[in-house]
């Protein structure tokens, strides 16, 4: 969990640094995917750069909106700020749009309900080097629903 807007969480950068010091890709594990649940782009990008050369993929899933920045970083870690969601994009991050609008209008917490429209499947495919566990290529995808894949 990221630390920005989630203050009750442990210091994720301290924990990540300790992990990197203790574990090595291709020695302790074949591949490493860092699923970094965070609110803001800069924090996710910093985590991607911290793990560059130590992880196969750093992906940030939390805002649910796919970004167009999939790439392999200079030391071989694939990165994307947000792979998107599996859900209805004719909604508010997968939840019923009107219910979400009412939450903002009334300034009170209301229960969220999933949207019932056609779902999209969003994600990434990473081509990895089995010798070192690092990425050779990353491609994002979107299937179904109202968003069109531009790749």
What residue spans do the PLM features occupy?
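Short, well-ordered, mixed-charge alpha-helical segments that flank or form enzyme active sites
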Residues: 4-9, 40-44, 67-68, 147
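Divalent metal-coordination and catalytic microenvironments
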Residues: 33, 62, 126
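Active-site-proximal beta-strand elements of phosphoester/diester hydrolases
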Residues: 1-3, 33-35, 80
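A short C-terminal boundary segment appended to hydrolase-like catalytic domains
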Residues: 100-151
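Conserved active-site and cofactor/substrate-binding residues in soluble primary-metabolism enzymes
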Residues: 7-15, 46, 118-121, 133
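Binuclear metal-dependent hydrolase catalytic cores centered on His/Asp/Glu-rich metal-binding motifs
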Residues: 1-29
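Short beta-strand/loop segments at the ligand-binding rim of alpha/beta enzyme cores
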Residues: 27-36, 54-58
